[in-house]
């Protein structure tokens, strides 16, 4: 991207850093990962989990959620002020799974938030270590992106459910900072802005007074984040219009919906980071690996290497396929929910299949599910090759895609053509070209019209053998262009509900 020079790298966002060189970035990301690992080891000790139970992804999710809840200032304050029956605002907890006489049992644990915060800070040299908290939020977000297609959320705001490839990070909390903003898709930002504008339409005081001023600042900041994701001047100019509007209303909602659609072809830059569950970092630290000393990157070979040697287990329901559960988690670990399945399959070395064909539900187990029939199995999270994660939309071109999803958002920097259904997308652009933004709209539509399906994105970029740590010998894969590339194809994925 042209403005790359003014941007901080993800690692800098991740670690709240000022400009750092590559070694310093690797060290500070390593420090963050090491902190998560140390915290996890300590929590396993507190909860008396044995090695196997500590590597169970469901236990990892509960422990991660406990620390995120302990540090959720706004919610904690809200809970203190609005006490609800049977909920202690000072406590946090969740289901912990243990093996008792050859059967898996669920045990609900409860801890003081203060105690959890103490353990977390102790593991992070006394710091609050917000970067580590954000890292866990992004892992949860990537898992949600892989598990659920946000059809309802899209429809509610008047967008097409087939635009799901724009929805990365849609379940990230607002407090996820710059690192969180970097991984949010164009659709996610548009959704947040539309919700805000709708509130303003319904509530006359939304933009008024001292609170209204803060709201306005937040609105403009979100507009700027979204503007920064677009790669064409016309899209950015339209964002300026939306941001500068005196009184945001339906015209702005229309402009935003238009921009979201345009992003299916003129894709935005969305960062991708491999964020792994805490139960991967814990055992690595326990085995004596020093992340800070060795350095770590979320966008290079490191997460692949870590997953090659990690043992992670998962509870499996009686009608689920363990291989399918593994695929779900592999995609989440690599932030590949909206990647082309041809590319994911090549990197993983086994066929990655669409969501609707997976016999697996989400990773979390609901409190009313029967534990008697639960078994556990090893998650297969290894890969055949590794590839660099991209933060660009890889725009040059396009191609046909599927019924359930009409575009993709690339994760890996690997040469290929990008599938999307041009006729379907362009059909949405008939009619309405009047109003303030008509010239920009016309220009955007022209760029979309001229996009050529045959062109190749990420020219010359390839995948690498796992032994090729320096990324010296790229292997440029060739893909069957006629093949289907979308994950949420024809979709019967579950709906995500908070």
Curated annotation (Swiss-Prot):
Residues 8-21 have a biased composition (Basic and acidic residues). Late in virus-infected cells, may be cleaved from a 56-kDa protein to a 53-kDa protein by a cellular caspase. This cleavage might be a marker for the onset of apoptosis in infected cells or have a specific function in virus host interaction. A motif (Bipartite nuclear localization signal) lies at residues 198-216. The keyword Oxidoreductase does not apply. The keyword Cell wall biogenesis/degradation does not apply. One of its GO terms (biological process) is viral penetration into host nucleus. A motif (Unconventional nuclear localization signal) lies at residues 1-18. Residues 1-21 are annotated as: Disordered. It is found in: Virion; Host nucleus. GO terms for cellular component: helical viral capsid; host cell; host cell nucleus; ribonucleoprotein complex; viral nucleocapsid. It holds the Pfam family Flu_NP. Keywords: Capsid protein, Helical capsid protein, Host nucleus, Host-virus interaction, Ribonucleoprotein, RNA-binding, Viral nucleoprotein, Viral penetration into host nucleus, Virion, Virus entry into host cell. GO terms for molecular function: RNA binding; structural molecule activity. Homomultimerizes to form the nucleocapsid. May bind host exportin-1/XPO1. Binds to viral genomic RNA. Protein-RNA contacts are mediated by a combination of electrostatic interactions between positively charged residues and the phosphate backbone and planar interactions between aromatic side chains and bases. Belongs to the influenza viruses nucleoprotein family. Encapsidates the negative strand viral RNA, protecting it from nucleases. The encapsidated genomic RNA is termed the ribonucleoprotein (RNP) and serves as template for transcription and replication. The RNP needs to be localized in the host nucleus to start an infectious cycle, but is too large to diffuse through the nuclear pore complex. NP comprises at least 2 nuclear localization signals that are responsible for the active RNP import into the nucleus through cellular importin alpha/beta pathway. HAMAP family: INFV_NCAP (MF_04070). This is Nucleoprotein.
